[in-house]
């Protein structure tokens, strides 16, 4: 079993299910997970993707499969997807987990992270790229832009999730206690095109409109999905 995306919801659900005595083979229902099965008898209304044998030899089929997957990254509208692997059965990807609420986002970033690299990297001289982001603040997740060059949708989704200002200030205050802190924060933001709020009034209950890339956002700023 694989937990994909950001993982907070699915990891907890997996742990609770295993703690209750369920075998891992029974955990076929958890959003934000991928699992292997022999047949599709326990998978409700799956989208059948091109087989592994097809996508590995045909670029057009590979692109077609990717397009189908891209259209099924919204937890409110996505369906399970099945890809066959010859005689070995199927790999099933369940729909993504629901996005975190602001309270859940705040809880995640309130945890006592060390902000240090794993000791295994010390003998290699650390991770140079960490120096640029160590004193940065993640304010949000997800992006509804839908830019053609970006695959962020596949692990953070298009539904914007934000932290409260209080949470950001608390983390910034903790940074000042780090002996390596030089007095300035490198960046406050996330993987979006400076989006901070949901793309429309229905995003958090109905999902994000399909086929509405970032170029649509400048048309009429206060429209809802229903208007479009």
Regions found by a protein language model. Give the residues of each.
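Glycine-rich beta-alpha loop elements in corrinoid/cobalamin-binding modules
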Residues: 1-86
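Flexible loop/turn segments at secondary-structure boundaries
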Residues: 9-12, 101, 144-148, 156-159, ...
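Short secondary-structure boundary/capping segments
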Residues: 17-20, 154, 164, 199-215
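N-terminal [4Fe-4S]-dependent radical SAM core
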Residues: 61-136
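N-terminal pre-triad scaffold of radical SAM enzymes
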Residues: 124-151, 184
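Conserved alpha-helical substructure of the radical SAM core
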Residues: 154-184
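Terminal amphipathic helices with adjacent charged low-complexity linkers/tails
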Residues: 176, 183-207
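Single conserved hydrophobic/aromatic residue that forms the stacking wall/gate
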Residues: 218-221, 225-227
